């Protein structure tokens, strides 16, 4: 054993490479060992330092792969044991145990987190070279008994299934101990670089290598000043000193100091000395020199996105100066927080990168497909799960448009559950869904799923065969190939597919002869897929490397950017969570020699010092350390290590916001510039932050409130939301010349409510999602149908019998059967509707002097060449004197208000009067009115009645009255019926005024509509609040900001309101 240490200003790799070259020149085979996370980079660095740039005598590798380079005569290789396979083995072991067999863990047998913790514990035991029987001194002795039962049973299964229980290091160590490699190892030299500690497994292997190899050489960074210290607690070199001291004591050798030819910039050395002095309680009488500051930068940004963009711009600047991507390293303080953001931003700046972290498979479409398949079986064909399977792109041969159409129909018809999916689709709507096509698609989906899901409990091998057959039927493999759109995606899909097939193979091997339910089979495969990871090697070496900052080594790259160095992440506080606590691990370590658990929390301090030291020396030319004030949407403080650097004299530069400019850093990259052109042109709109905008918005609201109290008015802002006019070509297509524009009373109301709403509904023909579940529209259709049947029945049957017959026959109609007999909720709605019919029907029985002339009457009202008004009149009544009137059924309370009508928001009754006047060749004297009938079940507050008598009945019938517009000429005939004529009587001249103004409203609307310019102008009655449809999700209308765009209604005092509005109508309609 040879131990070497050196100062941070020298290159330990160069020193060790020289030792390796000497051994290789003497004919020895040299293994250059690096940590798992650094072997790829260390290999490139070692080969760069060799004069010949490559050699077969020096092999750069890891401890775990070292055994591959030795020839050992052994028995046939056993099955490989990975984490997913281990989890399946533990699941099978727990299946064979009863809850009462495990007093401590019996309730967690099927818990996936518990199984993951068992896998981690098993791996820890292997690394620590401990067995489950060594777990003494636990807080609860029952825990050890349970763990012994579980792990021993799992190991029995491993033996039965011919799995290799030993790790590669254990197998290698056993071969060395048996003397199988003595001849080969005697000609071997092992060089170890980059370690500051060994696991128990590595420590044991190292002792064997030291006894059998020609030489073992280990190096570490320690300053001469620190090496001579007797008290090292808190020293920045504490981890390395303990590492060297333990090896020196164990192998009875003294470490030697060495230097390299390569000496790094003095600025980094001086910073290291200041950092060391701060932590070893010594003092220095000098500070950093001015030119030292050129090699360090401390940045502070507002949030992560700005921080990454500043880094990207700086990288582009480095490329402009002649450097390569491979000269740059980006370190992340929090991988999870930055991983999703850094990729898109680097892509925008066209910076190729390699993220040194295995990617989880959880977001891949194949995993989403398997998860949806499992949930479809578990939750009995839930619609969302079936659709997610289709949307993954891996099920069958369906276009996106087909899937969208299928989704729209299943939502409309509320298709969910196996029963509904297995039956042909028969329900249709006004949109006329293509049922033949949808049923063909349904069969293509249901048949393979049904064949798979009907599988009963059987052997695991049989279940896998059926699953593979199902995957072939839906063309999973072919669809998987079609997902990739780039070479990188092809490589990712290949890695995911390989993991998927490995999981199926492991399941077949472990559970092949075990009886399982399909749900358990799919759940195990899903769990394995979601927890699996894959890694893709970059296609070129000239990329920016990105990795976690705690994996960095000194002198890694010329330029290093370390971002996200907040107090919460730098230093990192690691706390182990698992089946064993750190206290239990410590007690076990005390009684075991050369076998021990790794306790991360016990080494936080010295490991963090070592990481900070490596980070501060990671660059050879320039180091940038950055911290955001907001990370993961929470405020965080500066790292204590960065505060030390500030005390050393390094300035903290506030990078501020990423204001767009015409500097080289902003316009030097075409793709980044292209993505920011719009923002540059709108720079005046982003001068305030979101926080500033929110502040001034709240202030504006408060100011307006105070001004209203003082009866002052604040000038409203200019129009913020604007719309474009339709092109002439579109106008000609939508509103062709010579063809009248079709309008209804409802469409006219929508136009005067908000013009943009009319544009969406009647020009673009956008509709809300339909549903078979009864809503107010279907409830209205039901009530209309019952009363239509009732009023058509002219038999001599008692009224109650006719009412029962009308309800019965309406309920028997196929449409209403489908709607109201689908579930208990629909049946309850039907019962309420029947109560409403029974409560409202007596009003028809009371008015025996009324004769129903027609029902559900279609009309087309001609108002000139420009417009054709259409609609349906619910009922036309005739009084005893022959006068006609219109009845409109309503499921909610309605009454005619002349002010609302004047503003265009209630044209329905007057439009019906105009239609009736055109349908029947009568003059205005023979129209008695137009009215609403509120179909309701009246609710009365019995507390207001002293006793139950006729007043109670009168109150009920008082609520059931016709309300609307009535002719003053027919006053006497109306007095005997259930008509509310108070404040609702109009003379013939006044009725003519209403009819003429109604025509004016239509013509005015048509003139504006044909111009093709629709405003965002929901109406407001008071200028303070907006009552019209704002359509916020589409228009982004805000009442506080856009009140100037709202249409102000004309309102008049209640006194003489009718006369005043009629006067206005005459003026505007030119009467």
From Swiss-Prot:
Protein name per the record: ATP-dependent helicase/deoxyribonuclease subunit B
Pfam family, one: ADDB_N
Co-factor requirement: Mg(2+)
UniProt entry keywords in alphabetical sequence: ATP-binding, DNA damage, DNA repair, DNA-binding, Exonuclease, Helicase, Hydrolase, Nuclease, Nucleotide-binding
Domain of life per record: Bacteria
Biological process annotations from GO: double-strand break repair via homologous recombination
Cross-referenced SUPFAM superfamilies: P-loop containing nucleoside triphosphate hydrolases, Restriction endonuclease-like
């Amino acid at each position: 054993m040879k131990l070497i240490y050196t100062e941070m200003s020298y290159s330990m790799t160069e020193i060790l490479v020289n030792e390796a070259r000497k051994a290789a020149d003497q004919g020895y085979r040299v293994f250059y060992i690096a940590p798992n996370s650094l072997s790829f980079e260390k290999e490139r660095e070692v080969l760069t330092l060799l004069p010949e740039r490559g050699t077969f005598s020096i092999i750069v590798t890891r401890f775990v792969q070292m055994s591959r380079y030795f020839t050992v005569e052994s028995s046939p290789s056993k099955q490989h044991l990975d984490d997913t396979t281990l989890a399946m083995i533990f699941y099978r072991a727990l299946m064979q145990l009863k809850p009462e067999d495990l007093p401590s863990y019996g309730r967690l047998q099927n818990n996936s987190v518990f199984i993951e913790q068992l896998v981690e514990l098993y791996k820890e035991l292997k690394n620590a070279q401990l067995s489950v029987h060594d777990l003494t001194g636990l807080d609860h002795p029952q825990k050890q008994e349970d763990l012994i039962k579980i792990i021993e049973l799992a190991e029995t299964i491993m033996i039965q299934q011919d799995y290799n229980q030993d790790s590669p290091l254990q197998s290698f160590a056993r071969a060395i101990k048996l003397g199988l490699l003595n001849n080969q190892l005697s000609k071997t030299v092992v060089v170890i670089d980059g370690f500051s500690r060994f696991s128990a497994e590595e420590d044991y292997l190292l002792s064997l290598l030291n006894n059998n190899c020609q030489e073992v050489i280990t190096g570490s960074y320690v300053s001469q000043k620190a090496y001579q210290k007797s008290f090292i607690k808190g020293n920045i070199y504490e981890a390395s000193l303990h590492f060297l001291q333990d090896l020196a004591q164990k192998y009875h050798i003294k470490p030697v100091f060495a230097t390299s030819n390569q000496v790094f910039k003095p600025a980094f050395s001086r910073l290291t000395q200041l950092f060391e002095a701060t932590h070893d309680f010594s003092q220095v009488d000098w500070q950093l020199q001015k030119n030292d500051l050129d090699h360090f930068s401390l940045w502070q940004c507002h949030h992560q996105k700005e921080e990454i963009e500043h880094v990207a711009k700086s990288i582009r600047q480095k490329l402009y100066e002649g450097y390569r991507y491979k000269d740059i390293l980006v370190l992340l303080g929090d991988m999870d927080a930055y991983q999703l953001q850094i990729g898109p931003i680097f892509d925008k700046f066209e910076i190729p990168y390699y993220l040194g972290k295995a990617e989880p498979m959880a977001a891949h479409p194949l995993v989403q497909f398997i998860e949806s398949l499992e949930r479809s079986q578990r939750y009995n064909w839930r619609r969302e799960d079936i659709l997610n399977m289709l949307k993954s792109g891996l099920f069958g041969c369906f276009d996106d448009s087909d899937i969208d159409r299928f989704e729209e129909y299943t939502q409309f018809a509320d298709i969910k559950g196996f029963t509904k999916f297995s039956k042909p689709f028969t329900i249709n709507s006004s949109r006329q869904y293509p049922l033949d096509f949808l049923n063909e698609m349904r069969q293509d989906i249901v048949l393979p799923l049904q064949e798979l899901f009907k599988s009963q409990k059987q052997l695991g091998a049989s279940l896998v065969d059926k699953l593979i057959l199902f995957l072939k039927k839906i063309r999973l493999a072919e669809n998987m190939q079609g997902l990739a759109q780039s070479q990188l995606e092809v490589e990712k899909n290949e890695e995911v597919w390989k993991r998927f097939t490995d999981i199926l193979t492991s399941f077949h091997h472990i559970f092949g002869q075990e009886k399982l339910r399909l749900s358990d089979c799919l759940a195990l495969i899903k769990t394995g897929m979601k927890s699996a990871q894959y890694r893709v090697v970059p296609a070129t070496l000239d990329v920016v490397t990105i990795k976690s900052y705690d994996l960095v080594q000194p002198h890694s790259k010329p330029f290093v950017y370390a971002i996200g160095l907040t107090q919460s992440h730098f230093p990192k506080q690691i706390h182990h969570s698992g089946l064993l606590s750190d206290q239990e691990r410590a007690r076990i370590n005390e009684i075991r020699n050369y076998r021990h658990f790794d306790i991360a929390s016990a080494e936080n301090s010295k490991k963090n010092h070592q990481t900070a030291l490596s980070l501060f020396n990671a660059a050879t030319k320039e180091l940038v350390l950055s911290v955001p004030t907001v990370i993961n949407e929470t405020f965080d403080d500066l790292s204590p290590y960065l505060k030390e650097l500030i005390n050393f004299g390094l300035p903290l530069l506030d990078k501020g916001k990423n204001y767009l400019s015409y500097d080289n850093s902003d316009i030097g990259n075409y793709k980044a510039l292209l993505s920011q052109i719009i923002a540059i042109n709108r720079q005046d709109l982003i001068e305030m932050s979101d926080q500033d905008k929110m502040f001034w918005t709240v202030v504006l609201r408060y100011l307006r409130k105070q001004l209203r109290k003082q009866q002052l008015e604040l000038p409203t802002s200019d129009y913020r939301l604007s719309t474009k006019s339709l092109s002439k070509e579109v106008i000609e297509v939508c509103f062709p010349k010579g063809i009248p524009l079709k309008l209804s009373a409802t469409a006219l109301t929508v136009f005067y409510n908000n013009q943009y709403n009319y544009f969406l509904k009647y020009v673009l023909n956008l509709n809300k999602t339909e549903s078979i579940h009864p809503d107010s529209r279907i409830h209205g259709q039901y009530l209309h149908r019952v009363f239509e049947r009732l009023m058509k029945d002219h038999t001599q049957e008692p009224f109650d019998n006719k009412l029962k017959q009308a309800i019965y026959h309406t309920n028997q109609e196929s449409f209403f059967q489908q709607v109201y007999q689908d579930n208990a909720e629909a049946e309850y709605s039907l019962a309420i509707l029947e109560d409403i019919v029974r409560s409202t029907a007596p009003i028809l029985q009371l008015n025996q002097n009324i004769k129903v002339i027609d029902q559900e009457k279609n009309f087309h009202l001609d108002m000139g060449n420009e417009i054709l008004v259409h609609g349906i009149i619910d009922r036309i009544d005739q009084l005893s004197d022959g006068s006609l009137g219109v009845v409109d059924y309503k499921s909610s309370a309605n009454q005619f208000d002349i002010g609302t009508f004047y503003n265009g928001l209630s044209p329905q009754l007057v439009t019906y009067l105009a239609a009736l006047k055109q349908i029947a060749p009568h003059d205005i004297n023979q129209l008695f009115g137009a009215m609403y009938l509120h179909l309701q079940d009246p609710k009365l507050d019995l507390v207001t009645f002293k006793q139950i008598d006729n007043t109670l009945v009168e109150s009920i019938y008082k609520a059931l009255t016709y309300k609307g517009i009535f002719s003053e000429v027919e006053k006497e005939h109306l007095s005997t019926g259930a008509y509310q004529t108070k404040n609702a009587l109009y003379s013939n001249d006044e009725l003519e005024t209403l009819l003429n103004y109604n025509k004016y409203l239509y013509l005015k609307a048509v003139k504006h509509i044909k111009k093709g310019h629709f405003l965002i102008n929901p109406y407001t009655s008071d200028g303070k609040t907006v009552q019209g449809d704002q359509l916020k999700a589409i228009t982004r209308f805000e009442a506080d900001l856009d009140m100037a765009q709202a249409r102000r209604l004309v309102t008049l005092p209640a006194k003489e309101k009718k006369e005043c509005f009629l006067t206005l109508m005459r003026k505007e309609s030119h009467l």
